Amino acid sequence: MAEGGGPEPGEQERRSSGPRPPSARDLQLALAELYEDEVKCKSSKSNRPKATVFKSPRTPPQRFYSSEHEYSGLNIVRPSTGKIVNELFKEAREHGAVPLNEATRASGDDKSKSFTGGGYRLGSSFCKRSEYIYGENQLQDVQILLKLWSNGFSLDDGELRPYNEPTNAQFLESVKRGEIPLELQRLVHGGQVNLDMEDHQDQEYIKPRLRFKAFSGEGQKLGSLTPEIVSTPSSPEEEDKSILNAVVLIDDSVPTTKIQIRLADGSRLIQRFNSTHRILDVRNFIVQSRPEFAALDFILVTSFPNKELTDESLTLLEADILNTVLLQQLK
């Protein structure tokens, strides 16, 4: 300390100069620490589990969270309804489903997309539900409409069936494979099932109004105390009026078969042939029944699996198409 109690010259100089400005080395150390913190932050974010999201313009996907550890988890995203319905149509198309002409649908719904997978010859089975009893040696031809809604599906005018129920999922898996589900096979005794599909995934299930129709011509076998309301199928005269103009000569001494033909416009023809008739006779029958197809080039294919009948000189027996469904496809 200087004489008189004042501060020493060196100490006074340090006080007057204030804090020391940071050097270049101090700045480098600060930047390095900042960079390390940023890297740690990014790495911690990248290690977090990510969810795969299936987007749909119609129905948002449902999310579930599954965790096996206190600090980690997995987001499980359930496919949307649109994905389920679109995959169902895609698989059905690959197994022989063909689009129907919207103008031929009785519903008149311009927004719906209708497909048909053709008919199938089914064996006898026990049936608990109400059914029509046809005359001897007649095949039962059952038409069923599968409607796919945003919240489930329904058969004809039946109740809503949610997609997530195991029995319903199994039903749709059979349709994807081009097979008639077992529960539909039980509806008939040695007949055919024609399954149509309609896309209504933009709408929620609409419960139809019950409409009473008087039955005529056929008996009904009841499987329960309360019979179900079943609509009466249209008569053959109303369904296939043009069939009267086509002449197919039948030899009663030769085995016969029943062929159903799904036409390109969505309508159908059903005709009895001898097993000795040729595929060319089937073509001629189509042209005679529907003269508008006479000038069009078309082929005939089996419904499942899809196979073009190229040799039209073969008999129906040789082509192995007895009691089957044929599809007409325009070239």
Swiss-Prot record:
Source species, domain of life: Eukaryota
Domain SEP: 141-206
Ligase in keyword set: no
Residue span of region Disordered: 1-26, 40-65
Residue span(s) of domain UBX: 252-329
UniProt xrefs under PROSITE patterns: SEP, UBX
UniProt-annotated location(s): Nucleus; Cytoplasm, Cytosol; Endoplasmic reticulum; Golgi apparatus
InterPro entries hit by this protein: NSFL1C_SEP_dom_sf, SEP_domain, Ubiquitin-like_domsf, UBX_dom
Keywords of the record: Acetylation, Cytoplasm, Cytoskeleton, Endoplasmic reticulum, Golgi apparatus, Nucleus, Phosphoprotein
UniProt-listed CDD domains: UBX_UBXN2B (cd17161)
Residue positions where Phosphoserine is found in the record: S56, S66, S231, S234, S235
N-acetylalanine PTM sites in chain numbering: A2
Record function comment: Adapter protein required for Golgi and endoplasmic reticulum biogenesis. Involved in Golgi and endoplasmic reticulum maintenance during interphase and in their reassembly at the end of mitosis. The complex formed with VCP has membrane fusion activity; membrane fusion activity requires USO1-GOLGA2 tethering and BET1L. VCPIP1 is also required, but not its deubiquitinating activity. Together with NSFL1C/p47, regulates the centrosomal levels of kinase AURKA/Aurora A during mitotic progression by promoting AURKA removal from centrosomes in prophase.
PANTHER family xref list: UBX DOMAIN CONTAINING PROTEIN (PTHR23333), UBX DOMAIN-CONTAINING PROTEIN 2B (PTHR23333:SF14)
Family of the protein in this entry: Belongs to the NSFL1C family.
Record's subunit section: Interacts with VCP. Does not bind ubiquitin.
Name of this chain's protein: UBX domain-containing protein 2B
Native source species: Homo sapiens
Gene field: UBXN2B
